[in-house]
Amino acid sequence: KAIKKAKQSSNSSHVIYLSPQGQKFNQKRAEEFLQHRKIILLSGRYEGIDERVIESEVDEICSVGDFVVSGGEIPALLVIDAVCRLEKGVLGDPDSASQDSFSDGLLEFPQYTRPDSNEFGEVPDVLLGGNHSEIAKWRLKESLRRTFKLRPDLLKKKVLTNQEKALISEIKSEENS
């Protein structure tokens, strides 16, 4: 009844059931979900929900990972947060979402704050120099380095530019020396 009522109050809603059996949720899926202006997230508890409801009311099944939790509430919160932050005006800086991990198929570059030097080390000089093209190159290289080390599977899926290929060669040389 709740699904039908929600559908009535918002025409053309897209119903997503959160279950480990669904297609895996990722940044690309968050961007796709944003295209649906009205979404109903359906979360089960313990054993899930009645199959007849899934067959008659659900448009797609979505999983947040290869694990099981007690209910779908926390996965629903993850989906809500990932989708909402892509909505124009939600983040203070409109460029923030486009620089996040996974937005371009890579992990995000390292972040540094003030002061320039503290007990944990120094901020890289290139970030303090003010040369925006050098900073952009450093960010790309460090993003590639981090992805290469921590999530090499992402690089296999990405179509690399010539610049990215050259930077990965540099990274491999640096790692081997």
Language-model segment annotations:
Residues L18-Q21, S43-Y46, G65, G72, ...:
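Fold-independent oxyanion-binding glycine-rich loops
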Residues K5, L78, A82, K137:
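Alpha-helical scaffold segments in soluble metabolic enzymes
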Residues V53-D100:
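Structured adenosyl-cofactor binding patch, chiefly the S-adenosyl-L-methionine
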Residues E32-Q35, I61, E119:
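Solvent-exposed alpha-helices and their adjacent loops that cap or buttress functional pockets
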Residues K1-R45, E51, K88:
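S-adenosyl-L-methionine/SAH cofactor-binding core of RNA-modifying enzymes
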